[in-house]
């Protein structure tokens, strides 16, 4: 392919990736960072195809008899919701294969335009009352409330909570869509957890995005099992979220965090769970590894245009700082180069995070600057392996702080109280160096004997350290050198 042909393909691909995002990124981060980001976007391939649940499977789910069914209240704050999106959102709930739900619509629109649309679509009907008529739901599982004023999304949602009678409350935006099996999968997972003796505090699923017409699905967000330090970097939990009704009603949404009210809620719920039982209580936070939610992208949505709700990202950073302050973590919440992604900066990590046994950074090849080590699975697979320096990787996760199952010995720092564990397993005294001025210290890997099995030692050490605390992957600990 000739150069100008390659350029034409690249420009077309960039347009699809949303030119507005690129221009906004340029304003925030400058030309060099934008060039690196554009290069990364142009290497990505969009091979995602959403595969819906089959009709046969939906029938099987509908026919299932539940001995002790979980009841859900789906809460949706409405405000000037476009007619087509409103219809599709409600229909996506009505078509659930799981029957034990109710849908609560809290309408803050100043006039009765949304109410009239609901009448026209058959979701509401008029009922005579004392010589007058008032709107009532055509389906007894649907509850419509017209709020007196638009007090903001947090306050509007709070006003809907007293109407929720379910054991769990699910959060759905007024222009988004649930998959038909969403509540079935949630109920099934929560009941299985209960059978294991676990009372789920909240559960979340994977999600993707769709265009305004739901003709294209893209950018799937395949999430991890609960990862504390990842949620301190980004609200990766997001959609679809269901939370214990009692817990959500006690916490409620806080209007001062409008735009990031979901993130603030999740952070406060996480704090409740951790206060209750530390890391062992994290099993009360459940991940369902299946796309159950379509986040609709259109001109006004945050998903399509980050600049449309910049206040939301500012509120997210304030929510993170509030979480750190409430948990007495001496740290400062800061932005990263990606909107909606944050970092807690610790002056001294051991003072701030006594729950952490070790921190580790990425290991870069001295030859071409690609990731060759850092965060690993318990089996030794390297996360983000081969990713060039400067690239953020899938959903920017290579640049985000997160808990790890294993860390690479070549870029690790050990909590002082755990250093005897290091010496017992690695077989050499633990010594630290600063490879570059201004950087945090790391283990001096040069004291290892020539030919040491780095991978095996890393995995053995990590397994032992996990019994003492978290293993924290901090991508701001980069070290460039040739592999031993």
Q: What are these language model-derived features?
A:
Residues 181-217, 350-380, 469-471:
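Conserved donor NDP-sugar-binding/catalytic core segment of glycosyltransferases
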Residues 147-164:
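Glycine-rich, basic loop-to-helix element that forms the pyrophosphate-binding segment
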């Amino acid at each position: 392919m000739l150069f100008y042909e390659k350029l034409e393909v690249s420009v077309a691909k960039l347009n699809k990736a949303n030119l507005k995002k690129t221009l906004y990124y340029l304003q925030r981060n400058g030309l060099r960072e934008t060039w690196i980001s554009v290069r990364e976007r142009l290497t990505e391939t969009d091979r995602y195809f959403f595969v819906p649940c089959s009709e046969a499977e939906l029938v099987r789910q509908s026919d299932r008899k539940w001995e002790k069914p979980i009841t859900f209240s789906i809460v949706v704050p409405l405000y000037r919701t476009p007619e087509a999106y409103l219809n599709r959102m409600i229909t996506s709930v009505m078509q659930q294969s799981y029957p034990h739900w109710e849908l609560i619509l809290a309408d803050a629109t100043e006039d009765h335009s949304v109410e009239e649309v609901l009448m026209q679509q058959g979701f509401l009907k008029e009922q005579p009352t004392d010589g007058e008529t008032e709107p009532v739901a055509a389906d007894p599982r649907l509850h419509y409330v017209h709020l007196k004023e638009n007090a903001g999304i947090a306050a509007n949602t709070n006003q809907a909570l007293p109407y929720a009678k379910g054991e769990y409350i699910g959060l759905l935006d007024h222009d988004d869509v649930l998959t038909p099996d969403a509540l079935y999968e949630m109920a099934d997972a929560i009941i299985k957890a209960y059978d294991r003796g676990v009372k789920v505090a909240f559960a979340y699923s994977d999600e993707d995005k769709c265009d305004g017409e739901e003709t294209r699905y893209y950018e799937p967000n395949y999430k991890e099992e609960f990862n504390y330090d990842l949620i301190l970097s980004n609200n990766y939990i997001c959609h679809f979220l269901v939370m214990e009704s009692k817990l959500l009603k006690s916490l409620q949404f806080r209007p001062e965090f409008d735009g990031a009210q979901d993130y603030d809620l999740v952070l406060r719920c996480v704090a409740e769970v951790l206060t209750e039982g530390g890391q062992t209580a994290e099993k009360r936070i459940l991940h369902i590894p299946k796309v159950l939610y379509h986040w609709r992208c259109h001109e006004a949505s945050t998903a399509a245009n980050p600049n449309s709700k910049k206040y939301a990202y500012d509120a997210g950073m304030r929510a993170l700082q509030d979480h750190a302050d409430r948990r007495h973590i001496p740290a400062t919440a800061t932005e990263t180069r990606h909107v909606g992604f944050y970092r807690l900066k610790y002056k001294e990590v051991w003072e701030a995070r006594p729950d952490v046994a070790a921190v580790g950074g990425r290991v870069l090849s001295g030859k071409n600057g690609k990731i060759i080590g850092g965060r690993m699975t318990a089996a030794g697979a390297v996360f983000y392996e081969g990713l060039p320096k400067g690239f953020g990787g899938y959903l920017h996760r290579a640049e985000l702080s997160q808990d790890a199952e294993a860390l690479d010995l070549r870029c690790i720092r050990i909590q002082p109280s755990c250093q005897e564990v290091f010496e017992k397993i690695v077989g050499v005294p633990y010594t630290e160096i600063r490879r570059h001025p201004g950087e945090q210290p790391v283990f001096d890997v040069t004291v290892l004997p020539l030919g040491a099995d780095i991978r095996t030692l890393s995995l053995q050490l990590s397994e032992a350290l996990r019994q003492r605390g978290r293993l924290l992957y901090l991508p701001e600990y980069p070290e460039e050198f040739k592999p031993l």
